[in-house]
Amino acid sequence: MKTNKTLMLGMLIFTFLLSVKAQAQEVAKPVFITVTTMYRNLEADGKDWRKTEQEYFDKVTSKNDLIIGSEILTHYYTANSAEILHVLVYKNWDDIEKSGDITDDLIKKAWPDEAARKVFFDKQRSYYMNKHSDEIYTSQPFVGSKELKTDSKNPMIVYVRKSHLSMKGEAKYYKEFNEKVTLKNPLIKAYYPHRHAWGADGREFLEAFLYDSMSDLEKSREKDDELIKAAWPKETDRKAFFDEMDKIFTGFHGDYIYHNEPTMKK
């Protein structure tokens, strides 16, 4: 069972972003988000990948009360077409560690026969390459966030922007920008800002924007421009504000677009 436990702990460490209904009433309290980036095994027959992950979600993830949110994101426009992100959300750091024991118990209950359990996890493991990376983030509700309000079972577009903090500037300017622009943009269905807690780069600041379609993502830029001009109608005021806000970041950022798997969402 040690092997299975280690595998699943790795898979259960996964970003971004999530519509966590349980946290809707605690928007001011940061949560922990684990992100595991895995890679599809392109040599394997992946036709049952979704069915297998759905079974695991139904029998394990959905029943683990310490996991308060989950997402699986698949490549849409990213640098690696094999990329699959597994995202889990917890109330605190301790729950990340404790959830492993609960997951182990749920696995034994779902597949009590050891031989059947081995068959299932061998199949699940076959869908992925033998490499992954782990990151842990904390949500940043003080700069503003927007919870997803939909029961739709259609996949959404998840645009992830990874920026680098300069460790200069003042966060109040980004909070003001989000309040006047991001949170007022009706095309942005949800917005989740996160900051690095554990992983490769302590400067990383990650934002997840959810849209109904790629068309909405493209049109949202025009809406942002409209809201910016309404919030700072004078060009001099606008320039002064953005000069201050831009000090927060190094200027480097990366863009990633994914589809989510709505039936495996918690």
Please annotate each region the language model reported:
Residues A24-D113, R117-K266:
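Short S/T/G/P-rich N-terminal loop/turn motif that feeds into the first structured element of a domain
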Residues M1-K29:
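Bacterial Sec-dependent N-terminal signal peptides
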